[in-house]
Amino acid sequence: MILMNLIEALTNPDTFFKKLSQKEISLKEPFLIVLIFSILIAISAYISTSIIYKIFPPQYQQVLAFTKIIALISTFIGGIVAWLIIAGFMHLISMIFKGEGSFKKTLSFTGYGFLPNIVGALITIPIAYYMREISQQEMRL
């Protein structure tokens, strides 16, 4: 049931959000979407910093190893913080235009808005990983 709803959110967002506006607001699914997105962007950041990490000489790599961990943690937290900031901004705009609705509803709708980002991350992570493999092979040559 959840998967069908998420597919509808991607393929027919008008219908999905109309149905969603009629239901009781729950933050479970939107939070799960943002959590998955945050995990995926953290993985992507780790892969990207791993590529950059290999460029530096060995004497700097120990210091830069910490950078990979910071990138992993900060992008994970950043995904969740971005959700809150974007929802807050959207709610503020809604208030300016005399919109009605709770912040919880805005937070919920904004969370579902992260769904296409998951699809994008699922496409870009394998590409980034492949690029990492290519860069490692080039360094061995």
UniProtKB/Swiss-Prot annotation:
Pfam families per UniProt: Yip1 (PF04893)
UniProt key word Transport: no
Keywords: Cell membrane, Membrane, Transmembrane, Transmembrane helix
Main localization (coarse): membrane
Transmembrane segments: 32-52, 69-89, 109-129
Membrane topology of the entry: Multi-pass membrane protein
Recorded GO CC terms: plasma membrane
InterPro entries: Yip1_dom
Subcellular location: Cell membrane
The protein's name: Uncharacterized protein MJ0794
